[in-house]
């Protein structure tokens, strides 16, 4: 299987999001990379499902709460920018204060 660097990055984020979901199910608090991966995956998959940029910007901040991440993680993430593929092309989605 020949994957471009971008495709490899997408798979890495998706796998990290799977790990993050499993940890949340077990009640384990997420670290920085897991939290970012989970929110990023939400945005990418939401774009594929047909949601709008505005909708994903808003809903991206409700994926995980402060109580689900390790101490200090929420303060480390001011915004997350995700380049996602929508039905009408690739767009940049910015989620401000993604962990509330």
From Swiss-Prot:
Reactions listed under catalytic activity: urea + 2 H2O + H(+) = hydrogencarbonate + 2 NH4(+)
Gene3D superfamilies assigned: Urease, gamma-like subunit
InterPro entries documented for this protein: Urease_gamma (IPR012010), Urease_gamma/gamma-beta_su (IPR002026), Urease_gamma_sf (IPR036463), Urease_subunit (IPR050069)
Keywords (A to Z) from UniProt: Cytoplasm, Hydrolase
Main enzyme class: hydrolase
Record text on subunit structure and interactions: Heterotrimer of UreA (gamma), UreB (beta) and UreC (alpha) subunits. Three heterotrimers associate to form the active enzyme.
Protein name: Urease subunit gamma
Protein source organism: Methylocella silvestris (strain DSM 15510 / CIP 108128 / LMG 27833 / NCIMB 13906 / BL2)
Lineage: Bacteria, Pseudomonadati, Pseudomonadota, Alphaproteobacteria, Hyphomicrobiales
């Amino acid at each position: 299987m020949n994957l471009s660097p971008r495709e490899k990055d997408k798979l890495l984020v998706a796998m990290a999001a799977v790990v993050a979901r499993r940890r949340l199910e077990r009640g384990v608090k997420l670290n920085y990379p897991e939290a970012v991966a989970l929110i990023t995956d939400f945005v990418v998959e939401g774009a594929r499902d047909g949601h709008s940029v505005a909708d994903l910007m808003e809903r991206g901040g409700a994926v995980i709460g402060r109580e689900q991440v390790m101490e200090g993680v929420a303060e480390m993430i001011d915004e997350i920018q995700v380049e996602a593929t929508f039905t009408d092309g690739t767009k940049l989605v910015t989620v401000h204060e993604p962990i509330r």
